[in-house]
Structures are given as C-alpha cells and as structure tokens.
Amino acid sequence: MIQQETRLKVADNSGAREVLTIKVLGGSGRKTANIGDVIVCTVKNATPGGVVKKGDVVKAVVVRTKSGVRRNDGSYIKFDENACVIIRDDKGPRGTRIFGPVARELREGNFMKIVSLAPEVL
C-alpha cells in the first residue's frame, strides 16, 4: 500500500527515476493507494534531458507494490518493489516505454496503453 511520503521507483522512460507521493486521489479521506490507483507525486530524482525534471509535480498510476493485492480467485500477487508510471490527464503514459512487469488490475482502471506497452502482464 502506498501512502503519503512514500517513495516509488518510476517504471517508464519519462526521465524521472524516483518520485515521492504527495496525495492519493479518489475520495476525501483516502489514506492508501494500491495497484491501479492514481497518485500525485513530485519528482525527486531525474535523468538529464528527460521529459520531466526534478521538482515537477506529476500524476502517476501505481503498477507494482510490495504489499501486493488479492485477486477474486483467492490468489495474491506481490512484487519486489513499489513502482509507478507517470501519466497524462487522458490516462496515457508520458514516456514511450514501460520497464518491468505490471499487474492485470490495470485493465480494470482503463490504463490500456500502459498494459499494451508493458513487456509482461501478470
């Protein structure tokens, strides 16, 4: 679960390497985000010449969490790291590539472009 002040790895080539969560979107008192939820972040570490710069405030969708998520068939899926993909307002990714696997739960959130760019969907 991702909450305020959580640092996440960025799993795309938008130029950001690491982001810090400012807010979890979706409700007035919402505290935590899981896979497929949108968060507001600030870029803490970025590569030179990227689309986003250090200090930029961006929206991102969570694609991997250490705590994992329970599926309807009773199985759980967990990852080794917390990771997100920086998105535009139309739910499309700001970068052109996605690194690492993403969870199938992104399909339910209509993040189809991220799912199609990902090398593996678990």
UniProtKB/Swiss-Prot annotation:
Signal peptide residues on this chain, from the entry's feature table: none
GO BP field: translation
UniProt xrefs under NCBIfam families: rplN_bact
Gene3D superfamilies to which the protein is assigned, alphabetical: Ribosomal protein L14 (2.40.150.20)
Repressor as UniProt keyword: no
Official protein name in the record: Large ribosomal subunit protein uL14
Biological role stated in the UniProt entry: Binds to 23S rRNA. Forms part of two intersubunit bridges in the 70S ribosome.
SMART domains: Ribosomal_L14
Family: Belongs to the universal ribosomal protein uL14 family.
InterPro entries membership: Ribosomal_uL14, Ribosomal_uL14_bac-type, Ribosomal_uL14_CS, Ribosomal_uL14_sf
Subunit structure: Part of the 50S ribosomal subunit. Forms a cluster with proteins L3 and L19. In the 70S ribosome, L14 and L19 interact and together make contacts with the 16S rRNA in bridges B5 and B8.
UniProt GO molecular function: large ribosomal subunit rRNA binding; structural constituent of ribosome
CDD domains: Ribosomal_uL14
SUPFAM superfamilies xrefs: Ribosomal protein L14 (SSF50193)
